[in-house]
């Protein structure tokens, strides 16, 4: 819920109502997420309501997921905070007909550069790849990406080895639908 609420967050009392849990359970869950540095609490806006105001819980902006979108002529890399805010985006041109291994290399170099230049104080939870083609759901193996000329390519596994990060992949259109329905 905190992730889906974006930058606006939810108050603890809203989380209690939305999740159907009692206040002490919500306090314990929020406390645990805070100790993991996945959420942050801030003071609520001033209002004229009676009683003690409930803190607002938001997703931490320093915890990010990286995205990779291989295209025919470029690879787009982005950093997205847990609340859904895009922090950085870079498009790196690639040669026509680049194979999967070449795309892995360009992606890994762009990620390394982006992390060093702009995101050194952020914690990466993983990389999500939006592939314009058929992707095997259980392991992200690219079965067929006709626009890229890729057939049976272990792009996800190779990118994980090259970056040392967890990598997941899915069809780009399916991911777009999921993002639209979530945010």
Where are these regions (language model features)?
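Short, well-ordered turn and helix-capping elements at secondary-structure junctions
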Residues: 43-45, 61-63, 110-111, 181-182
């Amino acid at each position: 819920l905190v992730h889906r609420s974006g930058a606006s967050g939810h108050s603890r009392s809203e989380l209690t109502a939305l999740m159907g849990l009692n206040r002490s359970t919500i306090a314990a869950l929020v406390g645990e997420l805070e100790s993991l540095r996945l959420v942050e609490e801030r003071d609520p806006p001033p209002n004229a309501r009676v009683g003690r105001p409930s803190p607002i819980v938001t997703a931490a902006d320093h915890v990010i997921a990286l995205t990779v979108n291989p295209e025919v002529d470029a690879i787009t890399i982005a950093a997205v905070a847990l609340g859904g805010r895009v922090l950085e985006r870079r498009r790196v041109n690639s040669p026509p007909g680049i194979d999967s291994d070449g795309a892995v290399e360009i992606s890994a170099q762009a990620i390394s550069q982006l992390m060093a230049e702009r995101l050194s104080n952020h914690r990466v939870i993983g990389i999500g790849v939006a592939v314009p083609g058929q992707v095997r759901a259980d392991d992200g193996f690219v079965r067929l990406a006709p626009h890229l000329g890729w057939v049976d390519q272990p792009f996800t596994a190779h990118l994980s080895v090259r970056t040392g990060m967890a990598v997941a992949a899915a069809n780009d259109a399916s991911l777009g639908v999921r993002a639209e329905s979530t945010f």
